[in-house]
């Protein structure tokens, strides 16, 4: 009788654990920590309160021979389709600031972050941006927000 070999599913580098606090499901413990720090400092900010469309969707009419987006499947004609928009939802949105908690950036985040900055510049929207990567930087973010209001 042959022994069955189970292949372990390969995990990506980002393994944030989902956490629930105050009835809100946070994508990571760092987001929950930021929420608690903002709440303690009485700074109003909405968690995932707004989604921005940084690149509009469009119809791509040209022929395009390629595999599916994940690199699998058959190499075939995949043009002539609607291309979906690129959207970005920051973790916290306040009156004049935006916070994105990123312990470890995934593959698409750096380009999405740059596109978001361009979107803000092109639309003349003024928001201070903060991107804390650990609890110490979350605390520093709160201090910076409070000092900017004096």
Question: How would you describe each model-predicted region?
Answer:
Residues 1-150:
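Electrostatic, structured charged patches in enzyme active sites and in nucleic-acid/phosphate-binding
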